[in-house]
């Protein structure tokens, strides 16, 4: 697959995640959750301060035939500043599958359910 095709698939994946999050949080505006341009450094989904209050995540998005959500979660963790208060979240969808999956670190999951 060409690099341009891979980037297009990644961009579409990011846009899908933005739509899902905006639907789940209707109180947020389109400016609160945005897909970042492909090839730019940092998180794949940019969150406004208002959106960060709802979910303090650093989001890494993967979409394709094969990917590793644990490695994607580690990728998000690696770019975060220590003690920033955000949690790394990896989201991914396989080709020909409509279901999105999310991976978080166990300590964050436990914090959510306590």
Describe each region flagged by the PLM.
Residues 1-114:
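Catalytic phosphate/metal-binding cores of nucleic-acid and nucleotide-processing enzymes, i.e., regions
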